[in-house]
Amino acid sequence: MKKLLLGSTIAFSAMVVLCFSSMAFAQQNAGKEFKWPPMLRIATPTTQSASFASTNGWGPMLQAETGVNVRIVPEDSEIRRYTRFCVNKEFDLVSTSIADVGHSIEGEVGYSMQEAVHQRAVWHHNDTPWSFVVRGDSKFKTIQDLKQKGVRVALSTQSPPMMVAVQEALPAFIGWTKEEAAANWTFVPVGSYAENCRTVTDGKADVAYVTPISSITFEMEAHPQKIRWLAMPLSDTNGWNAFLQLRPTVIPSTMDFGVPSAMGVDAIASNFIYWTRPDVDQEMVYLLAKWFHERFDNYKDVHAIAKRMSLNHMRNFLNHSAFPVAEGTIRYLKEIGQWTEADDTWNNAQIALMDRWVNARNAAIKEANAKKIKIHWENQEYISLLKKHTEGIPVFKTRM
């Protein structure tokens, strides 16, 4: 499979096609009084991520058609990305995994210190596969081989979901508690996703939690020793049940895109979605959803994961989504017959669930401030207060 980088030839060809389609899109929306803002601000993960590369593929096309200045900002720290998007409102759209949105709403780890803010799904970005990777010459051949003392595990500290994946969910899959993992493994902390990946090929860690679709993964694949993926067999129901207790928004799957070494390996799918907030102009969200659907054939080849932005992928996401959808997107989906009464039912239920989490989380912060309790995820007094406020609220779970 070709390397997941935006090629200049593809981009040029896409812009040529765009010249013939932009007038049609504008004419379809003639008579609408909506005026695009001077700038559409979009946040993505690091520059070495497929999310950043693919967004830079379709962004210039949207700009050429609508006249809006599309600004794409990479932010590798997921907590900083959340704060800038939700609290500071620096962005209108953000590409983030469903796992991370779950953590940010439920106040896991570093998110517990941040104000809780409602988020809404706009469009499916990609169904990102994830798994655990070792160097090609590693002595570890199966995921169960990790169940021994002395294993060095990369710990990507900028991402709470990735930390949970390696410190808690991976041990659970192989039949350990997080305490047993802490007692037997050596965690190698790193501050960025790229560092997390390179620990394996550089020999600093034995195993890392990695997606096969990023440009950095293709660099790993090109290493003289290559890389190898430790399968998470779909037949291991005990392992998966334990894993999903800790990562309830992921989906067991078989990897079918990314680096060649990942093909056919049983692993995880954690969808990346373009998200917005309810306070963002929903007319603009409606037009974005319309553009994503109607212009799919024009932008689908700008990057390998852009093909995962089809209406079919969006509809499949909706069939399992744990999170509410933006009003503007719902309006468009209703127009094209892709939204049902059943969708309204589950969506309203998820809005109500998110409202419970947001209210409880923010009430905990308010009480902590009033009592001068230090708001920090390592302060047990604050965490106990937070648990008191959120006790009994169900977590967000993928609808199977």
Locate the predicted segments by residue.
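Pocket-flanking alpha-helical
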Residues: 54-61, 71-115, 194-199, 213-223
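Bilobed "Venus flytrap"/periplasmic-binding protein-like clamshell domains
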Residues: 37-65, 69-71, 129-202, 213, ...
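An extracytoplasmic/periplasmic, membrane-proximal ligand-sensing/linker region
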Residues: 38, 212-225, 229, 287, ...
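Bacterial N-terminal signal peptides
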Residues: 9-21
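Positively charged n-region of N-terminal signal peptides that target proteins for export
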Residues: 1-4
